[in-house]
Amino acid sequence: MRAPRLFAVSLLIFIPTLALASDAEWRRYVIPSTGTSVDMPVSIFTSDGGAPESGTGRRFFTEDRRADLTVQSVPNPENDSPATFLAKQRPPAGIIYKRITPDFFVVSSIRNDRIWYNRCNRGNGTLNCVLINYPAAEKRQWDSVVTRISNTLRG
């Protein structure tokens, strides 16, 4: 009797998270000064966190602040390739996923039980990026959200 009850409780806990991407309200966010744009789930990232630490754009948080999304354009005055730009940023050890092309780079790592995902597209004098971080324990629930955000980054 205890196992079915435990299963029911875990369903109640995870059902809202499991429906994350499919039930989300999505809108296009545009950085006016650069034209960089991305689809973002406005029903998930409900709090405006203001300007990012570097570059132009915006930072957003979930209501409980367990996850955040930054959309930004970072100056690339030397027009470095994505590989060179990434190397200059000196990414941390522990990268679990990396893909670099002439047009973009993607890196992901786990730090402090959080997944950090970063995609930057090469622009004209900028790198246009999305940075997403969320609890590692919720990876499966966030996969479709991260994929859609990443695949819709333009600029």
Where are these regions (language model features)?
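Bacterial N-terminal signal peptides that target proteins for export
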Residues: M1-A8
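N-terminal "mature-domain start" segment
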Residues: S22-E53, L153
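Acidic/histidine-enriched, beta-strand-rich ligand/metal-binding domains
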Residues: W26-R28, W116, T147
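Conserved polar/disulfide-associated segments of primarily extracytoplasmic proteins
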Residues: S47-S144
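Short, low-complexity, Pro/Ser/Thr/Gly-rich segments in the mature regions of secreted, periplasmic
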Residues: W142-R154
